[in-house]
Amino acid sequence: MITKDTLAEYKTYNDPYQVEKDYLQDLLLYNIYANSSNEMILKGGTAFAKFYNSDRFSEDLDFTLSEKVEKQEEFAKSIIRNAVERLEYRHSYKEEPHINDFGTVEAVILVEGPKFNGKASTVQQIRFEISTGKKLYLGSEAMPRNSVYADARPYVALVMKREEILAEKIRALMSLKRRHRERDLYDLYFFMGKDTHIDKDLIHKKLSEADIEPSLEGFGKAIDSIEGTWKSLEPMVQHRLEDFSYVSDFVEKRIHESGVF
């Protein structure tokens, strides 16, 4: 455990609240990967920030559970409980581990971290999401994480490959009932800017799983529908947020050139 003053010395993010959450995420990820070497594949914004150098902060811990695991719901719940129990900071559940209608095991914990001063506003909230029953087409990569924080131990995480991340982000963007799709557009912009391969067959498989019709027009409409929420990303990125028109034009051009739709 580290003190509030020690934590204040770290400048991993502009916002001290984000620094504290980043630290607590590393503690929890160590706890997970100390007990689970081959079953939990990290994805989502936290994976992008910690392993792919994205500058977008993410609050959640998002995983896909390996198909090889039997009794997936029970296994996912036990992984969350074991990781949380080993956390040295005082904590409680806001939402106990449970499975939702989409086959995702979720939980939300409240943590009194180094910056906690007795007020409810200083309690950290961390959400777990573990997708069950989902097919991983490209496997995963074992990637080491040497955290900058003094008492956060190094760990090796299994991380979803960039090409599959990109395919899942296209599916997420085109899932019109999904919240925070501006984050999906930003992540597409980030990975396309890194020349991540756009795999047509993989993208079509991912869309088919969600009963989404592959369509350039539908993709464009999905992007247009989030223009009003684009600026909500400003507190979450560490550099100046690019204009929506620039990002959307860039992503749509890459998709058009790839011949995906």
For every predicted segment, state its role.
Residues M1-M40, F51-R56, S66-F261:
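Structured mid-to-C-terminal alpha-helical surface segments
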Residues L42-T46:
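Glycine-rich beta-strand-to-loop/alpha-helix junction loops that act as flexible
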